[in-house]
Every structure is written in structure tokens, then in C-alpha cells.
Amino acid sequence: MRAAFLLVFVGLVACGDDGGGSVSLDDAPSVFRAEYCRYLTRCGVVPDEAECAGLNIGFGSHVDPSLRAAIDAGKIKFNSAILGRCYHQIGSISCDRTDESARQFGGIACYGAILGTVDTGGQCAVDTECLSKMCDVPACPDACCQGTCIGVAVAPPPYQIGVACQTTSDCESGAYCDSTTDVCTALKPAGATCTSTNECPYGMGCAGLTGTRTCKTLPVVGEACPDGQCRDAGTYCTAAKACAKVGLPGDACATNGDCSSFYVCDGTQHCAQGAHEGESCAVNARCADYGNFCDNATKICKGLQPDGATCTSSSQCESVFCTGTTGAMICQVEPICI
């Protein structure tokens, strides 16, 4: 089966109020970035939304041409109003990573933004085209291969305890998606062994330095963090084992770990943006500017590459499609598969 389309991380949003207007397919990437920057600013991960807009925060401006073609062909329904509501809510996600809103990404708030229309037995190229969200595509040498929708239509979330799931956002409040059984399971009690915060009661996280991890209350700024974890986004456990706010540009630091994940500790021992386009990224390997990447061969920050340029991954291309044999890959126009 081929992976389903992702509409600029349509699932990376929280359930909450119903604000936000309609968002068109063309505007989806920029709206998502703006809402994500609002969240990062509010939680102290970046200094302000204006700086965030120009930072390399991991999301581009590309809309999958195959998604657009599938919508035009009627294989996928696109609802701009639901997407608008969905994206608007990301800026309101709780900075408390143990809060329910910080865990229940997607689910009913985003269901229906993109929906497949092809029934079982129908022709498909990707999972998202199918009502079952399962497209069985045989192995073939071509860039686009046609398959068949299999399975039964997927019911809308949230799912009750005991029902099959793919992610925790599929499950009802008070439950998580067990990664071993793929079934919605009741949250564990305080003190129970765990592998992920998703398993713990709201307000608690899964923590422990070595051996068994358990569900417990996580520390906040100013409190000791013997397990090396802090509760809130925008905070970290220092070398002295105390929770503190992450460093932003100009703040003193000893290592990259003292700075927000979007910044580096420079040679003056202060948090900084990192290398800009045309500058060396040999030391920290982070390029600061939106759309830039660190070229492995030259160790220089480069902008997105045009069709015909050499590449090692699709994220380096303007087309977001890098193909070819190892050592001879180039950026090309992305094939449309529907």
C-alpha cells in the first residue's frame, strides 16, 4: 500500500473552538505555517511571529499536484471550511504537553477536510482516494502505479475504547491508540508503566531516565527535572537538572541544547539563527532561512533547487521531487498519480 496524501499535515491540529474561515488548497501551506508560528510564539519557542515566518521550521509551500488532480477528478472531496477550522485551532494548542488538547491532534475537528470517494474494488493510486483509506498497489517500476481499494469504509472518529485505530487522535477522550494492538485503549492510571505520554492521565507524562518509565506529574520552569523532562513546550531540562525556558536569539548558552530547537549556540556562546543562504553550515548543519538546506557535499546553505539540479532528497527541490539512481539523482517535475 502506498502512503496517503498529506495536506500540509492536516492531522497536526487540536480539537477546540470552531474559529477560522475557509482555507483554499492554494492557501493551505501559508495558513498552516502562520498558525504553527502563532503556537510557537505563544509557547516561547520563537521570539515572535514575524521572525518565525522567515525561519526554516520544517514546512514548505508545496501542494501535492496528485492531490489537486485527485480532487479535480472527483476521487477526493476537499472541504475548505473544515480545513479552515482545522488549521485555525493549531495556534491554540496548549503549551502543556500533557494536556488533552496537546495530544488529541486531528480527529473529529479535521475529519472531512479531505475524504476519498472510491469504493472497495475501485481503481486508486494512493490510500486517500479510498473510502477505506487502503489502496493496494502492486510493485512496478513506474513512478505512478495503479492499484485497487481494499477493506471497508472508515467510520468518522472519535472511536470508542476497543475499536481499531491508527493514531490517538482517532480515539475518544480518555483513550489512546495502543501502538501494539492498534486499538483505542483507556488511559493508564498514575504510577503505571508506560512508553509514551499518550498512555498517561491528562496532566501527567511518561518519564524515567533508565529502565521502567511511569506516568507522573512533569516539572515546570524553576522545578527540578531528575528524569530529564519538563512539561511545557518552550522549556527544557538544564545540565543542572532544573526546568528553564529555552534560549532565544541573544540568550547565553553553552551547547545547542540550551537553545530552542530552531536555533544554535554560536561561537560567542549565544543562541543564534544559524547559517544563512551561501554561508557555511559545517559546524551546526542548520540553515536558518525558510526553504534552505545544508548541502552535504559543500557544507553550504542552499535554497531549493530547480528541475535538473542534483539532489539527495525531495526536500531539496522546488518541485519536492528528487528521483534517479544513487549518486545520480536530480530534481524533476513531480509525476501526477491519480
Predicted features along the sequence, with ranges:
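Short linear sequence motifs
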Residues: 2, 25, 29-32, 229, ...
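Bacterial signal peptide processing site
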Residues: 16-18
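Mature extracellular/luminal domains of secreted and GPI-anchored eukaryotic proteins, especially small
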Residues: 20-131, 138-159
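Secreted, cysteine-rich disulfide-bonded mini-domains of extracellular proteins
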Residues: 105-338
